[in-house]
Amino acid sequence: MSDQANQGDLEIRPSPLLKVINDLHSKYKSLKEGIVANYIPELAKVNPDLFSISIVTVDGQVYQVGDYQQLFTIQSISKVFAYGLALEDHGRDYVLTRVGVEPTGEAFNAIILDEQSKRPYNPMVNAGAIATTSLIKGAGATERLNRVLEMFRRYIGHDVFVDISVFTSERSTGHRNRAMAHLMLNFGMIDRNIEEALDLYFQQCAVMVNCHDLAVMAATLANRGVNPITGEQAVNSRYIKDILSVMYTCGMYNFAGEWAYKVGIPAKSGVCGGIMAVVPNLMGIAVFSPPLDIRGNSVRGVKVCEELSQQLGLHLFECMKVGNGEWGVGNCEC
């Protein structure tokens, strides 16, 4: 187990924050609750003992522990970034005609649309994400995929690739997603070829990342769309408010309300076992641990984020000092 990063020329220095995440990793690494996602055959093969925590601050400091270099497919966390790309392509008003922003108490893969508008409820559930991905511009399937991969590169700071075995596994078993897509096609929420739209959705979910990558992506959102490691603008800053608002209200599926109450920061989970959380103007947090609870969220990930929020005073509505400035983001106090 490593407790520091060695990625390029990133600045690493001893910090109370590193002790906090080391202690949390030690506390929860023996936890055996939850089960690995098994409805996608390739995901069922993942080692349930993998566990890592990464934090990247908006000034580029990195703190991490555990299996933070272990690659895994990004899955539903990709929905956050596809939504941002759709906003850049069409603007918020048009995107709102196709995908709502309302939380839903239903499961993330529920075959359901808003009864009045016939839109999917929000971009963070499967139906909404499929509709969002179908909005991404491009002359053809290859160009749209390349735009998605280039988008991820800006957020992460290096090239990414699609795990073909996971993509084909999801494609061959994604019948609920096809049902959602056909339902949305019927109501005019998708106007693209169904299989082409689904292929891009499955491909974006099968992009390979590690825990460090997720933390950099979260820190980019925390830094108004600027990657704190590379300095590159990954997404137009005007859409950060939209992205974080939907993450806060809808990002944790039908656990979103309890998450907002207990943790109080924008976040997105995925059935890969990843959780990505954003503390605006401060840091990005990522946790990877494959065993999931009944809602599809990482068991260890939820517990770690709850404790980080409590110990560091990260809840958006908590007015208190976060630290003494030693870990590079200064004090957060009202």
From Swiss-Prot:
GO molecular function, one term: glutaminase activity
Organismal lineage: Bacteria, Bacillati, Cyanobacteriota, Cyanophyceae, Nostocales
Catalytic activity reported: L-glutamine + H2O = L-glutamate + NH4(+)
Protein name: Glutaminase
PANTHER family from the UniProt entry: GLUTAMINASE
GO biological process, one term: glutamine catabolic process
Binding positions for substrate per the UniProt entry: S76, N126, E170, N177, Y201, Y253, V271
Record's subunit section: Homotetramer.
Keywords: Hydrolase
Gene: glsA
Coiled-coil ranges from the UniProt annotation: none
Annotated organism of origin: Nostoc sp. (strain PCC 7120 / SAG 25.82 / UTEX 2576)
Highest taxon above the source species: Bacteria
Annotated EC: 3.5.1.2
Pfam family of the protein (one): Glutaminase
Family: Belongs to the glutaminase family.
NCBIfam families: Gln_ase
